[in-house]
């Protein structure tokens, strides 16, 4: 048992730590881009993991995006991801997780029981889906988005590695 980790989070303990890697993004309203990403999952002894994420451009190192929030286990096999973006978007994604050997998979969405909140100046985002796969020291994910009048489609994908 990971020290002081709430029992409900034990199955997700391999997420804990710092991750870094590279990803790519695309959307019909923007040019394709590549980014460097850093993610940290931590805990404070309560029944949730803290989550911080930041990206920067591969080409010039300029900051691109960041998110902060919490990953909560609502019951075994069920998770909620609660995030805030500095662009004026908040999201609650609800989904499932499964553990098979050393592999953890999470499927999350705002479309069923989740929600998106928009500040008055935020771009219109109406749906987000995320898929995560953790296999040992590798974390990969994809994100689909429905926004600014476009249908739900692939937006981001990245592969990160555990930092020692």
From Swiss-Prot:
Keywords noted in UniProt: Heme, Iron, Isomerase, Metal-binding
Positions of short motif GXWXGXG: 17-23
Broad EC category: isomerase
GO MF annotations in UniProt: heme binding; metal ion binding; peroxynitrite isomerase activity
EC number: 5.99.-.-
Amino-acid positions noted as binding heme b in the UniProt annotation, renumbered to this chain: 29, 123, 155
Record's signal peptide: none
Cofactor binding mode and count: Binds 1 heme b group per subunit, that coordinates a highly solvent-exposed Fe(III) atom.
Domain of life: Bacteria
Listed InterPro entries: Calycin, Nb(III)_bact/plant, Nitrobindin, PeroxynitIsom, THAP4-like_heme-bd
Domain comment as written in the entry: Forms a 10-stranded antiparallel beta-barrel structure able to accommodate a hydrophobic ligand in its interior. In fact, this fold hosts the heme group, which is located in a wide surface cleft.
Family the UniProt entry places it in: Belongs to the nitrobindin family.
Subunit description: Homodimer.
Name of the protein in its database record: Peroxynitrite isomerase 1
Source lineage: Bacteria, Bacillati, Actinomycetota, Actinomycetes, Mycobacteriales
């Amino acid at each position: 048992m990971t020290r002081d980790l709430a029992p409900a989070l034990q199955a997700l303990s391999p997420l804990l730590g710092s991750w870094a890697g590279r990803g790519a993004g695309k959307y019909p309203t923007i040019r394709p881009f590549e980014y460097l990403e850093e993610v940290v999952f931590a805990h404070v002894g309560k029944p949730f993991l803290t989550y911080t994420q930041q990206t920067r451009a591969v080409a010039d190192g300029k900051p691109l995006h960041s998110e902060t929030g919490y990953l909560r286990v609502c019951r075994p096999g069920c998770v909620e991801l609660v995030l805030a973006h500095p662009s004026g978007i908040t999201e609650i994604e609800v989904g499932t997780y499964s553990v098979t050997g050393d592999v953890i998979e999470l499927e999350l969405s705002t479309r069923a029981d989740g929600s998106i909140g928009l500040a008055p100046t935020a771009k219109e985002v109406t749906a987000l889906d995320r898929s995560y796969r953790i296999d040992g020291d590798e974390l990969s994910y994809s994100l689909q988005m429905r926004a600014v009048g476009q249908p739900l489609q692939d937006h981001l994908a990245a592969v990160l590695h555990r930092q020692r």
